[in-house]
Amino acid sequence: SAMGIIMAATWILTLPDRIRAINSKNMNTVKSVILDISGGGIRFSLSTPLEEGTYFMAQFSLALEECTQQFNIVCKVIKCTQSLDYADRYFARSKFIFDRITEREKIVRFVFEEERRIRRREME
């Protein structure tokens, strides 16, 4: 089931040096929806195909312990496939390239809390 987290913007990085690319001005913004998230990466849908190995900046927010936190994390595309149902829809899997381990811990905590909430709802 879709988590419904909207990735506000995804900047596609074209340079091999990802740090310089993140700061460069020639970045396209791609609207996409995160379908699944884990401590290791995200699966999302978008309207433009991404090449495997592409680095991009994922910008999204998660509700963590009563407050919403913004994340800006560099990701690397692992796989991108076209939807069987819609010609203009693609599904991509990417792994996080973390600068700080605390970001990963916060995402893992979000996933854990979300699973606990779902289990609680199923038991009601």
Predicted feature residues:
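Structured alpha-helical
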Residues: 1-124
